Amino acid sequence: MEKELINNSQSNIYPFHMPGHKRRGSDIGAGLDPYAIDITEIDNFDNLHHAEGIIKEAQAEAAALYGAKRAYFLINGSTCGILAAVSAATKRGDKVLVARNCHKAVYHALYLRQLHPVFIYPEITRTGLQGQITEAQIRAAFDENPDIKAVVITSPTYDGVVSDVAAIASVAHEHGALLIVDEAHGAHFGFGGGFHQNAIALGADAVIVSLHKTLPAFTQTALLLLGGMREAAVEKFLGIYETSSPSYVLMTGIERCIHYVRDNKETAFAQLRSRLDRFYQKVSGLSHLNVVRKSDFSADEAYDFDESKIIIFTKEAMNGHTLLELLLKKYELQLEMAAGNYVLALASVMDTDEGFDRLADALIEIDSQLEKYKSDFEEFYDILKQEGVVHKFYLPVKMDTDIYQKLPAVMEMYDAYDADHQAVYAFKASGKVSGAFINIYPPGIPLVVPGEIMNDKLIDDVIKAVNSGLEVDGLDFDPDANMWKFVAVL
């Protein structure tokens, strides 16, 4: 592992992926040997779970930066903060309004606290991305379920789609419910550069931000920010979900990140915006690839769009996985992820002019090659295979706008998850109660959750996704029969 990590760090591969420090720790003053500062809770170094000294001061600095009532360091990642926030906002058996596109940690919290979810579904955009959650959806859900105790949404999404958090917070508070926002992909919000305001400033009661995703911080470092949620309840559940052996290396990394943003926000985010604008201008004339901008979304699809999420659609030419592989092997650009018809590159304040130029130049060259071979794309792929830069070709797969069905639930999710299960072949699964989550990555929205009844369309959609080269989680494969199996409740 160490050898591979060193090789990667010394290579010419440019990281358009998280973590947001982009392997440039020296640029934020991170020069210490991690072993030299790796300690436990010895005298004068405070205790994360009973912070009274230097950790308390560092957390107060984070709260001040984001405008929060309190901030808690998370060194188990945003997952820990999501579990704590949902648990603190509810009592066992409560009803919770949950955006279906929430992170799996939200579903784990529903399971652990035996909560009853009411799901709302984001619209799928014309291009196949998951869209926003709207104020109207939230209001309609409360009209049907006035006993909802908490609302949980993700904004921005992995792809950068932002919902109207202020309006959603207003509706939730009007009905006496708390609003929890998974803002893991928006830790850079609220600091200028034309990026959206952060959810705490917009009225959310608890907000989880993953510093490591978009800011210069170590992987698995995050913050739980409080607005209107009770501190005592949050601290109780952080004591359960967060490690009792917190890393001072990671906590110091959080503090360093907070100081960097505090001291450089006036220039760093404006510079990032300038670099993004220059990049988008360079690639605006592509014919066979399409780089998305905010103007590509209708008002119904997105309240706002985070342009530090660089989405490159492949149109008719190739699958996202093919483009991802081509960019890595030929151009030494490692992007964040690939989908059926697009790839995603993540930009941060630590990216350089060189990085953006390399990505723009690569896309322009690929687009020109696609134009050259537009009458016979197969010839182009044959050349790429001969060069060893692409090993497999998939056709583009656009996510159907109706793929996320509202399936009937006949069991509580936690009961179905704990029940005895059987693996059934695809052709026998329709009509059975799911015992597992089935997700297509990206975007990772569960097509079915435990307790819901599977139907023919679900099974057809899942098998289609597998055959198209997409990553599908929640299935079993029988190599002897060469068939997929679905997990069903006995």
Annotate the PLM regions.
Residues 1-53, 441-443:
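N-terminal "arm"/small-domain region of PLP-dependent enzymes with the aminotransferase-like
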Residues 281-453, 460-477:
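Conserved C-terminal alpha-helix-loop-beta "cap" of PLP-dependent enzymes
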Residues 2-6, 28-29, 50, 65-68, ...:
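Conserved PLP-enzyme active-site core in the AAT-like
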Residues 43, 422-426, 478-490:
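Flexible, glycine-rich loop/tail regions that form catalytic "lids" or insertion modules at the edges
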